Amino acid sequence: MAPSSRSPSPRTKRLRRARGEKEIGRSREREDDGREREKRNSRERDRDIGRDRDRERKGEGERDREVGDKRRRSGREDTEKRRRTRTDDERYSRGRHERSTSPSDRSHRSSRRSPERAIASRHDEGSNARGGSEEPNVEEDSVARMRAVEEALAAKKKEEPSFELSGKLAEETNRYRGITLLFNEPPEARKPSERWRLYVFKDGEPLNEPLCLHRQSCYLFGRERRIADIPTDHPSCSKQHAVIQYREMEKEKPDGMMGKQVKPYIMDLGSTNKTYINESPIEPQRYYELFEKDTIKFGNSSREYVLLHENSAE
């Protein structure tokens, strides 16, 4: 009979399992190593490509500089040649004037002059005349070439960053509910100790209850209801029309000493139809002190705002 096959022992199973796990770990390590090598190779390729591009840019810049230097040198050489030509012409003309100009001498010299010399002199005179007429064109060409090189170099220069203040930060810090305010409270802003009120009249008749003005240091008037403390809905009023600001100011006391007191002031914020105190228009962007029983009007509205406080006489 054939011997019966035995199942592997638990120890053998554990060994096989450990061996299989090691093989799996090795294969994973090999895969990870392969990935790392590929990443390194790709990074090296990218670096090589970047170096090649940098070399190409440097080469282009050097070539442009060489072209500019050659053009400038050629322009200088042309100028030097023209200067030499002028000097030679001056010397030749000076020598001709120094010689005798009598008719007998001229006829004697012309008879002795050889035909070759006459032809050569005529050729020189023609070349000088042509060169003199071409001088301005050569100068214009050299100047045009130099300007073209300078413009090309200037175009390649990158625009330098500007570090000047743009005012955007200050604008963002002075925003309320998405709207840029036209007014900033001054350092001397304070809440009033007196209970000031505005009594509203229209055509001599009081409207609603008086407006209390003692709970905060400033009150904004205007048509923009999202930011106005006291809305003024008349079409002639601006969105940010005017502001009443309480300021702590120095004041002389009855005994002659200086003391501080919180007083109300009004400022027109550059409105279209102005702000009025006792029927007189006030200048924009300037503080005007308000006194008890002053009457304020905004734009062409018929409403009148009378300023009083709790201790005002009836």
From Swiss-Prot:
Positions of region (Disordered): 1-146
InterPro entries attached to this UniProt entry: Cell_Proc_Reg/RNA_Proc, FHA_dom, SMAD_FHA_dom_sf
Gene from which the chain derives: DDL
Organism from which the protein derives: Arabidopsis thaliana (Mouse-ear cress)
Main location group: nucleus
Name of the protein this chain belongs to: FHA domain-containing protein DDL
Tissue-specificity statement: Expressed in roots, lateral roots, vascular strands of roots and leaves, vegetative meristems, pollen and developing seeds.
Effect of S238A: Loss of interaction with DCL1
GO molecular function per UniProt: RNA binding
Subunit comment: Interacts with DCL1 (via N-terminus).
Biased composition range(s): Basic and acidic residues: 18-127
